[in-house]
């Protein structure tokens, strides 16, 4: 179900963020863009874009932007969107997503080169569906490799294979110690 009333949806998100600031003791400012003019750093065109700023911004972007992703997830729940429609809402902070997209592209290019030279599949650590999709799109433009997602839930990851060899076994990535993703 798409977002029918963008202004009402933006008001709900603003209310959530105001409550988060008040009850959480956070100092975050936010700007919400709605409609066809909304756009995010990943080149997608969500219905609602929320740009965060303020003194507590580092809290939002640390640990690979986990809090940023969590805020998006909560916003999707508040708006009662289907999980597959999560891309209709985008949160960003200090251009974090554009920088992360650039980091993913560079990592993908390095992984592709490694797979082409070695002939051995490469597995990225588990990541959210948006980042996996970004990687799949980057790899589409790179020759000599193919990709596939594997695993389930928060352990889902992207594997890179030599072209035509997706039947090769891939070693699933290991989570770093002290890292937990719920």
Please describe what each predicted stretch is.
Residues 2-182:
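Intrinsic disorder
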């Amino acid at each position: 179900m798409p977002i029918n009333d963008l202004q009402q949806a933006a008001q709900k998100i603003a209310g959530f963020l105001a409550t988060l600031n008040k009850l959480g003791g956070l100092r975050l400012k936010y700007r919400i863009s709605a409609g066809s003019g909304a756009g995010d750093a990943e080149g997608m065109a969500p219905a609602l874009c929320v740009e965060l700023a303020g003194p507590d911004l580092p809290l939002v972007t640390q640990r690979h932007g986990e809090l940023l992703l969590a805020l998006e997830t909560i916003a999707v729940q508040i708006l009662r969107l289907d999980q597959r429609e999560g891309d209709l809402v985008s949160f960003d902070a200090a251009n974090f997503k554009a920088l992360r997209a650039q980091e993913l592209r560079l990592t993908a290019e390095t992984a592709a080169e490694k797979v082409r030279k070695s002939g051995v599949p490469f597995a990225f650590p588990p990541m959210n569906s948006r980042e996996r999709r970004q990687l799949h799109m980057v790899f589409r433009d790179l020759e000599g490799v193919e990709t596939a997602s594997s695993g389930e839930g928060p352990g889902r990851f992207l594997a890179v294979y030599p072209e035509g060899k997706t039947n090769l076994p891939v070693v699933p990535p290991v989570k770093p110690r002290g890292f937990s993703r719920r």
